[in-house]
Amino acid sequence: MEKFEGYSEKQKSRQQYFVYPLLFQEYIYAFAHDYGLNGSEPVEIVSWNNKKFSSLLVKRLIIRMYQQNFLDNSVNHPNQDRLLDYKNYFYSEFYSQILSEGFAIVVEIPFSLRELSCPKEKEIPKFQNLRSIHSIFPFLEDKFLHLDYLSHIEIPYPIHLEILVQLLQYRIQDVPSLHLLRFFLNYYSNWNSFITSMKSFFFFQKENKRLVKFLYNSYVSEYEFFLLFLRKQSSCLPLAYSGTFLERIHFSRKMEHFGIMYPGFSRKTLWFFMDPLMHYVRYQGKAILASKGSFFLKKKWKCYLINFWQYYFFFWTQPRRIHINQLANSCFDFMGYLSSVPKSPLLVRNQMLENSFLIDTRMKKFDTIVPATLLIGYLSKAQFCTGSGHPISKPIWTDLSDWDILDRFGRICRNLFHYHSGSSKKQTLYRLKYILRLSCARTLARKHKSTVRTFMQRLGSAFLEEFFTEEEQVFSLMFTKTTLFSFSGSHTERIWYLDIIGINDLVNPLN
């Protein structure tokens, strides 16, 4: 217990002060507006009433939030219209959203300072060819072949709002800022309840994207911080951890010690550490814990995690959220793929002098398969096909021009091929390509009030084929040192696109 407290105090000693005054600096909200609401496009900050933005209005909004009438209304009537006075200039939803984004930027400052304070001599070199999230797959192919068990963890998130505030107290000791955060959370939810309503949570997430990401990453980093402590105490072997792997940043070289880092709290979602016995990968609210050893050891780690969430974060997580499987006999859902490590037979001919004989060996192989049923379900939900995969037209797009229709269908088709390009079996991708191509033809035929056969005879199938194979031409130019191939043929090459981050949302392709 003393080791645990000492380990925790190291983080508490780096608390930050005087964050609250920054909330009244106008340039903070200019950054929030440009970066949080309108991406990277610089725009003039103008309200709904066409009045210039002023930090004085933010100050008034904060003062009104502290008034008793507002608090009573937000707590006792959480479901009524939160725009108490829509015509009131400084009480509009626009400024509430700006204040939320500005607050998130301000509280991220201490973590950014911590990143800048890292020693320069330990700067990790960047590898341009490993910047994609898909560079994790070669790592899995290299390491998972030698492991025995895998735990698939759904990181529990429904947590009491007060716990989220308390977690920040370890690193931010600015009482006014923490009070303001409490008022903001009260603004959307009653303190006597949990965030178990998915409708209310998604509403809060939609209006406060940056703040939600910061709170979520704060919670996850706290959980992983003490998970590392448990890992250090669970083995007497010398520990030599790899550094953090952050999405679109770099692979790190072997370091003597593993240090917790908090760079880019708003967007970085992938992180792993490893040692000779255990590997940890986190992505999109899920985590994978793979290791050697016995089944009893994995059960022990499962109990560790359940008790940790219960006694440290004060909420109960169901044991079924942690699945333990043997790698050789099961598959797991990972980033839109069904991955497994099966044993494949390999027949080898051996020649000894005048005698020859065959040796049948079984080799492990990291296999990735496209989930056909899941992807067809997404296409069906988006009204490109029926539930059984039969292509249908998309009436809502018939008002678009022919080129826009072709462009939309073609972009979806190419994105699906991009994201699942590393699959070991391409039959599912060819089926998806057929569904999208025929759905496009039926949509165009419906627009021109014709049949698919008549429309295709008039237009010719060559144009559609050329449109959908445009990406294949780029594909062959990108890999000139390898054997060229066409998507229309059969091949077994597995190529992970290195620019996949731009369409990373295709893990759930059409949502």
UniProtKB/Swiss-Prot annotation:
Principal location class: plastid
Molecular function as annotated in GO: RNA binding
One GO location term (cellular component): chloroplast
GO BP annotations listed: mRNA processing; RNA splicing; tRNA processing
Domain of life: Eukaryota
Protein location: Plastid, Chloroplast
Keywords: Chloroplast, mRNA processing, Plastid, RNA-binding, tRNA processing
Pfam families: Intron_maturas2, MatK_N
Family to which the UniProt record says this protein belongs: Belongs to the intron maturase 2 family. MatK subfamily.
Its biological purpose: Usually encoded in the trnK tRNA gene intron. Probably assists in splicing its own and other chloroplast group II introns.
Protein name: Maturase K
Organism this protein belongs to: Hordeum bulbosum (Bulbous barley)
